[in-house]
Amino acid sequence: MFRGASAINLDTKGRIAIPVRYREPLQLEHQGRIVITVDIQSACLLLYPIHEWELIEAKLLKFSDTDKTQRSLKRLLLGYAHEVELDGNGRILLPPPLRQYANLDKRIMLVGQLNKFELWDEQSWLQQIDECQETIRSEELASNERLADFSL
């Protein structure tokens, strides 16, 4: 499971180094293979270990090509999907179209989301955190059925 936010750098060749604490689990459980695609609701990228991505592909396979929304979702997620492999230094290459989609520059944030990572431009991530905090403050959490019994 992936958790926590790590500030990392994008090198001049478009590579990022996955933090050391994640490398061994990715190598052992997923042979270092990751699928990167776009987040359809935010300007960030989603990085899935290969076995997690295969579960998503199985769901996408059931989508109808005649339903406009399903076809659009499938087109975006699969059209941008790139499989990459950790190199000997724990780095992966982010293809240019994906870097452009998420407006990634030198400083980026890798954010663990249990079964996947999000990859954000650092400034966009900070803005997203502010928006998340505002959303939480403005909501009546107890009225949300899924959050009613959530306590920290």
From Swiss-Prot:
Superkingdom per UniProt: Bacteria
Major subcellular location class: cytoplasm
Any Pfam family matching the protein: MraZ
Keywords: Cytoplasm, DNA-binding, Repeat, Transcription, Transcription regulation
UniProt entry tagged with the keyword Zinc: no
SpoVT-AbrB domain boundaries: 5-52, 81-124
Compartments, as annotated in UniProt: Cytoplasm, Nucleoid
GO cellular component terms given for this protein: cytoplasm; nucleoid
BP term (GO), one: negative regulation of DNA-templated transcription initiation
Molecular-function GO terms, alphabetical: DNA-binding transcription factor activity; transcription cis-regulatory region binding
InterPro entries: MraZ, MraZ_C, MraZ_dom, MraZ_N, MraZ_sf, SpoVT-AbrB_dom, SpoVT-AbrB_sf
Family: Belongs to the MraZ family.
Database matches in NCBIfam families: division/cell wall cluster transcriptional repressor MraZ
Oligomer and partners: Forms oligomers.
Protein name per the record: Transcriptional regulator MraZ
Gene name of the encoded protein: mraZ
